[in-house]
């Protein structure tokens, strides 16, 4: 039996493996149209590129987050249960105290997870408000109590002074997602603010030498070509970590009952992200357990080298102990 040849576009993309240079837009758009067994060939290439050039040096970058203020958000992001514009049934509370943050951070450190993120609902902090100063005090306390734990934050849109203060207080990474191709943000995500608010925040953070964790969400009504546009937008913003979320439709939000996204499209998105970003950390976030289910390991073999463990903001995740076993098993493919 004759061997089945690789698709010509995949053969062309193998240059990334040799050079470490990203594929061009034209080739990325073409690869996004692959179907059937060719998708697995694409995934295999992305996995090889990750192992040779990836940002996590062959290991898996794991992080855990804490929802430090929940709900009553002024923004109308269509997928989000925390928006005050929607009717999702979630826990609502103000900023938690430092003892609650320390409890979760200690648990994260005890489980061998290197990065811990403080996340708050809301538009963000344009000035050094009383609440923002409370968060800075939390960060200082975490550094004192857990000096080996990398402290991260996701606090929404930031003004110049808050961004500078986060740098002064030693934040390791800041998460703020552009979510989709920028030109479709207002239509697919929110119209109470603009994607430029987020992009300006990213630029402020980078000016202050803070590493940025910036990703998106797939399955909100975008097309594959627009996922490719989003992936290239990450390159323009000089981000360090790219978390990709898969929509988990939540009752009470505008996207409840969404039909979902084909699994091969998800695999292609992760693989293309790796081929465009050979050296970045690419992380699986929401949807890993609930959407991918039995196939979540496939994403780790399609270019991803990071994951969010221990749960999400308003949806359950998987126990960290189970994820540690998952990460050990994945080493067989390195």
UniProtKB/Swiss-Prot annotation:
[2Fe-2S] cluster binds at residues 152, 213, 283. It comes from Chlorobium phaeobacteroides (strain DSM 266 / SMG 266 / 2430). This is Biotin synthase. GO terms for biological process: biotin biosynthetic process. Its cofactor is [4Fe-4S] cluster; [2Fe-2S] cluster. It catalyses: (4R,5S)-dethiobiotin + (sulfur carrier)-SH + 2 reduced [2Fe-2S]-[ferredoxin] + 2 S-adenosyl-L-methionine = (sulfur carrier)-H + biotin + 2 5'-deoxyadenosine + 2 L-methionine + 2 oxidized [2Fe-2S]-[ferredoxin]. Catalyzes the conversion of dethiobiotin (DTB) to biotin by the insertion of a sulfur atom into dethiobiotin via a radical-based mechanism. Pfam families: BATS, Radical_SAM.
